[in-house]
């Protein structure tokens, strides 16, 4: 490898690491701030950390193309200001040769992004879902608020009049809709919510259970003691149905071949997400290529050192915005997936064309 290429890469890599750490940390902190309320619910620091660290793969997957562009443009602009690019250009090095060091780095980042997209991203979301269910089940008692309708699970809502010490609750109402044909309401004077084998169970005292049967008839049952087991989502992680799974929990191969049992709108969203996982990592190469193509076309001028960077950034933002607009349409109509690939191909073609052909 030529010396100037090694020099360029040695300049790009440290800045790329710094920018990745800085930008990801800022976005990550904003996500963490939204979850700080969990400390008021008694969550342990280790459980909180295990939860928030699982968000990082998603952030990296989304941010890496933009981070790579920032690092590349910053280094190349510095090299131009210091006239090192000018010296190389006057010595016969063309634009495509100047861009190669950055493109090598971009290609490496693209491969990393594909690994995140294909393996780490779905794995982290599966674990994230599991951790959320673990926290919900094990801290459920502290998360229930007085005089508020608390949605414990998808089909169970609980109202508590008053919470006492020793995990005792007074004035309990439980709305149980797990059986859609026979919804029930339970009223209890008091009770406790305990965890047995990671399963939250209400132990109720002196109350009334009302239920409608399939014919709409109301049945009532009074009780002195009643136990209601809440569905433990964490124990059902491996049994999560196709309808309950989120798109980020699927691997790419699963997204491309969704289950026939799914509704058509869910199938379309999953297939669109699969192509997003395939297309977006490519922008780790395409966006730096396009940005450098625009940047290197501008001749050096002390008065307008910022203009090449500005036009390069605007070009990248325009292509990125078009991609996400088309991706949004594709999640509703799969015909727009071809437009997503076309946008990528056009951006790459323009970038390579501008790098290869000299400015007239």
From Swiss-Prot:
Transmembrane segments: 12-32, 52-72, 96-116, 278-298, 306-326, 336-356
GO cellular component terms, semicolon-separated: ATP-binding cassette (ABC) transporter complex
Main location: membrane
Source taxon at top rank: Bacteria
Keywords linked to the UniProt accession: Cell membrane, Membrane, Transmembrane, Transmembrane helix
Membrane topology of the entry: Multi-pass membrane protein
The protein's name in its UniProt record: Uncharacterized protein RP871
Protein's organism: Rickettsia prowazekii (strain Madrid E)
């Amino acid at each position: 490898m030529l010396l100037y290429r090694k020099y360029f890469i040695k300049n790009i890599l440290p800045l790329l690491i710094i920018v990745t750490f800085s930008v990801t940390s800022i976005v990550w902190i904003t996500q963490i701030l939204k979850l700080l309320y969990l400390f008021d619910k008694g969550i342990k620091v280790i459980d909180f950390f295990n939860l928030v660290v699982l968000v990082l793969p998603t952030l990296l997957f989304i941010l890496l193309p933009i981070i790579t562009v920032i690092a590349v443009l910053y280094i190349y602009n510095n090299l131009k200001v210091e006239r090192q690019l000018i010296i190389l250009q006057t010595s016969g090095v063309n634009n495509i040769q100047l861009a190669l060091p950055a493109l090598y780095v971009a290609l490496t980042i693209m491969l990393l992004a594909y690994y995140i997209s294909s393996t780490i991203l779905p794995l982290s979301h599966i674990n994230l879902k599991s951790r959320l269910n673990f926290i919900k089940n094990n801290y459920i008692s502290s998360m229930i608020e007085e005089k508020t309708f608390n949605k414990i699970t998808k089909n169970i809502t609980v109202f508590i009049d008053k919470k006492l010490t020793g995990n005792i609750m007074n004035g309990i109402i439980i709305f149980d809709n797990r059986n859609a044909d026979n919804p029930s309401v339970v009223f209890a004077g008091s009770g406790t919510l305990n965890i047995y084998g990671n399963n939250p169970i209400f132990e109720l005292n002196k109350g009334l259970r009302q239920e409608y049967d399939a014919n709409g008839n109301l049945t009532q049952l009074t009780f002195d003691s009643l136990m209601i087991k809440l569905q433990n989502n964490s124990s059902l992680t491996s049994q999560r149905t196709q309808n309950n799974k989120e798109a980020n929990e699927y691997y790419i191969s699963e997204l491309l071949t969704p289950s026939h049992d799914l509704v058509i709108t869910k199938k379309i969203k999953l297939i669109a997400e699969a192509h997003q996982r395939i297309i977006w990592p490519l922008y780790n190469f395409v966006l730096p290529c396009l940005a450098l193509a625009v940047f290197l076309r501008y001749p050096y001028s002390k008065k307008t050192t910022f203009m090449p960077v500005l036009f390069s950034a605007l070009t990248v933002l325009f292509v990125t915005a078009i991609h996400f607009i088309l991706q949004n349409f594709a999640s509703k109509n799969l015909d727009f997936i071809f437009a997503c690939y076309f946008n990528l191909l056009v951006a790459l073609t323009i970038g390579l064309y501008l790098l290869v052909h000299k400015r007239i």
